[in-house]
Amino acid sequence: MGLENLKPAKGSVKKIKRVGRGQGSGMGKTATRGGKGQTARTGYKAKRGFEGGQQPLQRRLPKIGFRTKDSHIYSINVEKNEAIKNLEEITFSSLRALHHFPLYIEGVKLIGKDAKNLASKIKDERIKTSGQK
C-alpha cells in the first residue's frame, strides 16, 4: 500500500459551500439568505429568546417562585388532626415530623375549638394557639 492509495475516511471531508458566485451554482444572487429583510443583512443576530415578533415564551408563561419577606406562619386545624391531641409535648420539630411543612416556615398556629386546651402542652415559642398573639 503506497501513499497514492490513501483516502480520507468516508464522510470526514465535506465539499466547501461557495455562495454568491453566480446563478449557475444554485447559490447565487441572495447567497442562500432568502429574500430581503433583517435576516438577509450582514451582522444580524437574533436576541436569545426572540421569536420574530411573536410574544416570547418567557413572557407568555406566568411569573412563579415569589416568596414574601413577611413571616411565614403555618396553620394547623386541631379538629382535623387527632395526632396533635395525643402528643405529650408540642414542639416545632414534632409538628414538622407530623406535617412535613416547608423549611422556610418560621412559626405554627394551632386553630380550632380544642386549640386553647392544648396551650399547656406547647413547649416552643414558635407555636401559638388561636386567641394568642
Curated annotation (Swiss-Prot):
Record keyword rRNA-binding present: yes
Keyword set, alphabetical order: Ribonucleoprotein, Ribosomal protein, RNA-binding, rRNA-binding
Coiled coil: none
Paired cysteines (S-S): none
Annotated GO CC locations: cytosolic large ribosomal subunit
InterPro entries: Ribosomal_uL15, Ribosomal_uL15/eL18_sf, Ribosomal_uL15_bac-type
Extent of the signal sequence: none
Region Disordered: start-end pairs: 1-64
GO molecular function: rRNA binding; structural constituent of ribosome
UniProt GO BP: translation
Protein role: Binds to the 23S rRNA.
Subunit structure of this chain's protein: Part of the 50S ribosomal subunit.
Similarity section: Belongs to the universal ribosomal protein uL15 family.
Protein name (Swiss-Prot/TrEMBL): Large ribosomal subunit protein uL15
